[in-house]
Swiss-Prot record:
Main location per the UniProt record: cytoplasm
Class in the EC hierarchy, top level: transferase
MF (Gene Ontology): glycine hydroxymethyltransferase activity; pyridoxal phosphate binding
UniProt-recorded name of the protein: Serine hydroxymethyltransferase
UniProt-annotated binding residues for (6S)-5,6,7,8-tetrahydrofolate: 121, 125-127
Species the sequence originates in: Phytoplasma mali (strain AT)
Single GO cellular component term: cytosol
InterPro entries: PyrdxlP-dep_Trfase, PyrdxlP-dep_Trfase_major, PyrdxlP-dep_Trfase_small, Ser_HO-MeTrfase, Ser_HO-MeTrfase-like, Ser_HO-MeTrfase_PLP_BS, SHMT-like_dom
Length: 419
């Protein structure tokens, strides 16, 4: 892995030791968490610069602090690159996270207790799309659409039926564990019929959208698009808001600052700008294409080994596996813990119509972006499929698992990070 920290040292030995251990873990693991990735050396370096010293409340040329002339240029570059990448008219690059980007949209477009409609959390939605545990469900009246019980995909006729029944002010699309292409145009038609705003949260698929490998919600006339800047976009941890509507961007800018945040994280915004430039390169499209190839191949391979893939296949970077299809006594928690013992890192995940709790689950979520960054192609994912099946089949044999772990470490070390 090129992201070595051998030349990095801090006096705080306790923290330094943990950083070194985490570096070792990343080097020696196969990371299949769909929301994680490995940033480039440039993105990593920029986050550790003196830009972290500068407070810059406000927006370029409208700051509340002096000394922002270079900071202004950095933020303007980030905005220009974001709008070019996603073919948008306006962008706000200040949100600290995807959740805060979503919160800003809610503040900008809604009043407390307005109705919102999103995919249920148990079917692949996100906490910020109306969960009662989250601000989106506490301060707004949230309703949900689900997936078709037979196809495990979105039933657009059912979404329309619910929308007519509740008349939401905001309809939300974009998900955290949905493996099919999203028909943004159908959502736009539904939103028009009930006079609702349409928000697309593309946090997971933003890299695919930017590369033209997934439909763009702005082309389908979504009112606003939110995203994280990590995941498939392969930038720093952070948020992003896009729109083609000047009135909406003015409201969003006020909702981000002063509505929800104070000073922006300029070292992160600079890293976002670097990541956007990387994503504008033709190599990024090749990378996204390989993500898709790997995901489709990976899902098919596990299917051949007897694992049920939710909705039968994937059309993006991730998919869900029903682990009970292999053994009714299995749970997502149990399988994710077993795989962790052999350095294969996944997350447990609820599946549609799951009877297990979110802390236990009947499924696991698998994604290909991180290991595709490391250089994995179909041959490597064939080996990963074998490793997963072997670990699950021999989960009670500690000697077998220890030997398998060494194979995983060897494969992982053969693909150091090269960007």
């Amino acid at each position: 892995m090129n992201q070595e920290i051998n030349n990095f040292y801090i006096k705080d030995q306790e923290i330094f030791d943990q950083i070194k251990l985490e570096e070792k873990r990343q080097k020696e693991s196969i990371n299949l968490i769909a929301s994680e990735n490995f940033v480039s050396q440039d993105v990593l370096k920029v986050q550790g610069t003196i830009l972290t010293n500068k407070y810059a409340e406000g927006y370029p040329e409208k700051r509340f602090y002096n000394g922002c002339q270079y900071i202004d240029e950095i933020e303007k570059i980030a905005i220009e690159r974001a709008t070019e990448l996603f073919k948008a008219k306006y962008a706000n690059v200040q949100p600290h996270s995807g959740s805060q980007a979503n919160m800003a949209v809610f503040q900008a477009l809604l009043n407390p207790n307005d109705r919102i409609l999103g995919l249920s959390l148990s079917d692949g939605g996100h906490l910020t799309h109306g969960s009662k545990m989250n601000f989106s469900g506490k301060y707004y009246e949230s309703y949900f659409y689900g997936l078709n019980s037979k196809t495990e995909t979105i039933d657009y006729a059912e979404v329309e039926k619910i929308a007519f029944a509740i008349r939401p002010k905001l309809i939300i699309t974009g998900y955290s564990s949905y493996s099919k292409i999203i028909d943004f145009k159908s959502f736009r038609k539904i939103a028009n019929k009930v006079n609702a705003y349409l928000m697309a949260d593309i946090a997971h698929i933003s890299g695919l959208v930017a590369s033209g490998l997934h439909p763009c919600p702005l082309e389908a006339q979504a009112d606003v698009v939110t995203s994280t800047t990590h995941k498939t976009l392969r930038g720093p941890r952070g948020g992003l808001i896009l729109t083609n509507n000047k009135e909406i961007i003015n409201k969003i800018n006020k909702a981000v600052f002063p509505g929800g945040q104070g000073g922006p994280l300029m070292h992160i915004i600079a890293a976002k700008a670097v990541a956007f430039k990387e994503a504008l390169h033709s190599d990024f499209i090749k990378y996204q294409k390989q993500i898709l190839k790997n995901a489709c191949f990976f899902a098919e391979n596990l299917q051949k080994k007897g694992y049920r893939i939710i909705s039968k296949s994937t059309e993006n970077h991730l998919f869900l596996v029903d682990v009970k299809s292999k053994n009714p006594n299995f749970t997502g928690k149990k399988i994710s813990d077993i795989l962790n013992k052999v350095n294969i890192v996944v997350n447990k995940n609820v599946i549609p119509f799951d009877k297990e709790t979110p802390l236990i689950t009947s499924g696991i979520r698998l994604g290909t972006p991180a290991m595709t960054t490391r250089g994995f192609k179909e041959n490597e994912f064939a080996k990963v499929s074998d490793f997963i099946d072997e670990a699950i089949t021999n989960h009670n044999d500690l000697n077998y698992l220890n030997n398998l772990k060494q194979k995983v470490i060897t494969l992982s070390k053969n693909f150091p990070l090269k960007i």
